[in-house]
């Protein structure tokens, strides 16, 4: 039998059974291969992700220790989506969202839908309903660890219910994946870290909620606080490192560092200076920073203050950095050693 006739017959049978468009050639529609993205609020992280930001229609996992900047990063993504007219929702399972802080990061509270569910099942059903509507662009679940199964809430404190949360997540993700892709909604799961007992070799760290999220996530970001930013004796922010542990859209294992200032969020001006020095756009001579033979200031904080007062120069540096994004991506990949890659695979 002729292969082409057999294929045509099979395709027409599939379309009769499941509807037109249930199967097609990948190159038939140009839009199929295009990836829409939303900025993370960090220029260096957008470059490290390889596609200019977090991809829409995918599952994202952000995990790390306490007070490392997980929720801050998710709120920045919401703010960036809202700037482009996107509809966003926040499922606050931890009941800990601070609206005042969210507003300072640029989130439009009037157009942010918030839910504070009582159980894990309720949280995931709300998530599924919003995703299926096709009207939501970004949905954040904070956090996986707080998605407590109903059986655990109704039971006694002494009850042992192993694997209950992992089964809940596995079932929910099986149902959600297809809807997320069809609706082009980005779902960000914030997760916490736990320690595995009795691990002799490799990293003892693991994330909550079982292994399902690790498989279904297209992007996994490991965010850590690596130091403090001080103004004289007062701590005003955190130095933060983010590793792209998994990336289905570009090469993974890139690593970036940026500042998170208390009450402001990610310091974009600090990133412009750091990235500019890396590619030679901003010159550093001793403690002095300069751009196009114009001195920005002595010391990083003074240079940041100069850019804050001269927004047009900051915009010029950002444009130049975006044009050098390919070169920067290679630099970011080279920063990560083999040891770090081995450790990432353990989590």
Swiss-Prot record:
Q: Which Pfam families match?
A: RecA, RecA_C
Kindly list the positions annotated as binding ATP: 64-71
* Keywords on record: ATP-binding, Cytoplasm, DNA damage, DNA recombination, DNA repair, DNA-binding, Nucleotide-binding, SOS response
Q: Does the keyword Nucleotidyltransferase apply?
A: no
- Mind telling me which GO cellular component terms the entry cites? cytosol
Membrane spanning residue stretches: none
- What this protein is called in its record is Protein RecA
The species is Bartonella bacilliformis (strain ATCC 35685 / KC583 / Herrer 020/F12,63)
Gene symbol of the encoding locus? recA
């Amino acid at each position: 039998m002729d292969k082409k006739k057999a294929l045509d017959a099979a395709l027409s049978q599939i379309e009769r059974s499941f509807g037109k468009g249930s199967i097609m050639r990948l190159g038939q529609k140009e839009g199929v291969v295009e990836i829409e993205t939303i900025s993370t609020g960090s220029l260096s992280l957008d470059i490290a992700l390889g596609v200019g930001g977090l991809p829409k229609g995918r599952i994202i996992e952000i995990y790390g220790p306490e007070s490392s900047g997980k929720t801050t990063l998710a709120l920045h993504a919401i703010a960036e989506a809202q700037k482009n007219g996107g509809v966003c929702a926040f499922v606050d399972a931890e009941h800990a969202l601070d609206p005042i802080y969210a507003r300072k990061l640029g989130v439009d509270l009037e157009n942010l839908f918030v839910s504070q569910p009582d159980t894990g099942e309720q949280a995931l059903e709300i998530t599924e309903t919003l995703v299926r509507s096709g009207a939501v662009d970004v949905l954040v679940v904070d956090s996986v660890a707080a998605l407590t199964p109903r059986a655990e809430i109704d039971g006694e404190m002494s009850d042992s219910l192993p694997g209950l949360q992992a089964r809940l997540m596995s079932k929910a993700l099986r149902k959600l994946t297809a809807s997320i892709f069809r609706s082009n909604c980005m779902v960000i799961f914030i997760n916490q870290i736990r320690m595995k007992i009795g691990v002799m070799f490799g990293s003892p760290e693991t994330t909550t909620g079982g292994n399902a999220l690790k498989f279904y996530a297209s992007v996994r970001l490991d965010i850590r606080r690596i130091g403090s930013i001080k103004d004289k004796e007062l701590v005003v922010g955190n130095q933060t490192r983010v590793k792209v542990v998994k990336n289905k859209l570009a090469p993974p294992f890139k690593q970036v560092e940026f500042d998170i200032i208390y009450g402001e969020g990610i310091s974009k001006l600090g990133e412009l200076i750091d990235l500019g020095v890396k590619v030679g756009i901003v010159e550093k001579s001793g403690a002095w920073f300069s751009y196009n033979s114009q001195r920005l200031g002595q010391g990083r904080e003074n240079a940041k203050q100069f850019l804050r007062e001269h927004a047009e120069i900051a915009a010029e540096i950002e444009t130049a950095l975006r044009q050098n994004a390919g070169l920067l991506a290679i630099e970011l990949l080279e920063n990560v050693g083999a040891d770090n890659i081995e450790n990432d695979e353990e989590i």
